[in-house]
């Protein structure tokens, strides 16, 4: 118990000495040991790394989870060391709504079939988003969080310890300076004509006491200087480790870009497949024209089928041979044609469509009754339907 009280009193004395030294430094009444320029640069770089890492971490969390309530919930689960429950993505929720709507409105109708197809694509988008969030959290967010909660806390602890060692060192310097000044004053030879013998003896005793005080202060200064140098070296090594942190974060950033590229490539592929599937749906993107034959009531079904003109928008309903024949018989409209540059490669879904290669030039035009998302494209002797989204129309 007595030992604990002595230690408590000693700690209180050290704390008071540091507080006095810190206050006098702030008011310019005490000298302060300055760190070298290289050390100051290391401190500034470490602080900058910590600040920007926090900002990047927070904004990446917002990117992956825009809902602030969900982010708070995930944060609480992590602090409680509990597994974060699986959360349905917005794409998966939209897919469920579309599937339910198709079931209620009629899955066999054109609208219902389209809802089902779009729901499948949205579900795939939601799954891709879930994989991206999981991959980005492991490969990018976790290393950043580990730096802030691990390495940076160690650096901060050692920096605080270095600050205390510096205050102790400067306090010892101030104490030694005062002791030397008092010793110099005490060792001044008194005037025997004005000084009584008794005062002379007291002056000699005081001089001896101040000599002991100077020796003690010098010993404390040497110990404080050694501890300060040792702590400065430890802190310097930790600060120089920030370079390794930058290398690690650079590798993690490459992983994040890779996962994000994979995610958007999957989304593009899913939507491209969806667009092709919707383009092949009969009755979904079908344009019609007025029949050139007599009314069906005055002709037989065979005669009506033979006399009905076939346009490219319904060529997919006919056999391949007939579809090709009909496309060859289609003539450009009187309003003229336009040139278009192909933006992306496109694989024809059937014989009524024209396969495209990126950056090639083709001639395009529209026919009455065609869906606005499609045009007729010509390249040499070949012609067929092409999606507008794959083209850049030239003036």
UniProtKB/Swiss-Prot annotation:
Domain annotation BAR: ranges: 24-287
Q: Which residues carry this modification: N-acetylmethionine?
A: 1
Tissue-wise expression? Detected in skeletal muscle, adipocyte, brain, lung, colon and mammary gland.
Q: Which residues carry this modification: Phosphoserine?
A: 10, 395
The record's subcellular locations are:
Cytoplasm
Subunit structure comment from the entry: Homodimer, and heterodimer with SH3GLB1.
For this chain, the family text in UniProt reads:
Belongs to the endophilin family.
- Region: Membrane-binding amphipathic helix; residue ranges are 1-27
Boundaries of every SH3 domain copy: 335-395
Q: Which GO terms fall under biological process for this protein?
A: membrane organization
Q: Which UniProt keywords apply?
A: Acetylation, Coiled coil, Cytoplasm, Phosphoprotein, SH3 domain
The name this protein goes by in its record: Endophilin-B2
Supply one GO CC term from the record. Answer: cytoplasm
Principal location listed in the UniProt entry: cytoplasm
Any idea which GO molecular function terms this record carries? Answer: cadherin binding; identical protein binding
Q: Which organism is it from?
A: Homo sapiens (Human)
Residue runs in coiled coils: 116-132, 206-240
């Amino acid at each position: 118990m007595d030992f604990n009280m002595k230690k408590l009193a000693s700690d209180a004395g050290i704390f008071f000495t540091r507080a006095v030294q810190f206050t006098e430094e702030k008011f310019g009444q005490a000298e302060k040991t300055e760190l070298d320029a290289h050390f100051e640069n290391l401190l500034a770089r470490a602080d900058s790394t910590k600040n920007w890492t926090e900002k990047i971490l927070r904004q990446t969390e917002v990117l992956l989870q825009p809902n602030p309530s969900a982010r708070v919930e995930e944060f609480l689960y992590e602090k409680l060391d509990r597994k974060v429950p699986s959360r349905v993505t917005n794409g998966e929720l939209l897919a469920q709504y579309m599937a339910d709507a198709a079931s209620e409105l009629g899955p066999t109708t054109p609208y219902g079939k389209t809802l089902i197809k779009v729901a499948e694509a949205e579900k795939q988008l939601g799954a891709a988003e879930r994989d991206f969030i999981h991959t980005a959290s492991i490969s990018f967010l976790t290393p950043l969080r580990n730096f802030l909660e691990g390495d940076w806390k160690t650096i901060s602890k050692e920096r605080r310890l270095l600050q205390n060692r510096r205050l102790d060192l400067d306090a010892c310097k101030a104490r030694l300076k005062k002791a030397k000044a008092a010793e110099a004053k005490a060792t001044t030879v008194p005037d025997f004509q004005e000084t009584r013998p008794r005062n002379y003896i007291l002056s000699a005793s005081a001089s001896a006491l101040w000599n002991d005080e100077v020796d003690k202060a010098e010993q404390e200064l040497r110990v404080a200087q050694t501890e300060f140098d040792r702590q400065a070296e430890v802190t310097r090594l930790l600060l120089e480790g920030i370079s390794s942190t930058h290398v690690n974060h650079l590798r993690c950033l490459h992983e994040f870009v890779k996962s994000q590229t994979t995610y958007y490539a999957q989304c593009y592929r899913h939507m491209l497949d969806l667009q092709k599937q919707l383009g092949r749906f009969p009755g979904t993107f079908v344009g019609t024209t007025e029949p050139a034959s007599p009314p069906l009531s005055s002709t037989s079904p065979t005669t009506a089928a033979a006399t009905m003109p076939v346009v490219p928008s319904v060529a997919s309903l006919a056999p391949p041979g007939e579809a090709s024949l009909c496309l060859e018989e289609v003539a450009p409209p009187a309003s003229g044609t336009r040139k278009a540059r192909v933006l992306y490669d496109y694989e024809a879904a059937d014989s009524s469509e024209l396969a495209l290669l990126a950056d090639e030039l083709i001639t395009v035009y529209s026919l009455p009754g065609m869906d606005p998302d499609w045009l007729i494209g010509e390249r040499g002797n070949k012609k067929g339907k092409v999606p507008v989204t794959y083209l850049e129309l030239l003036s």
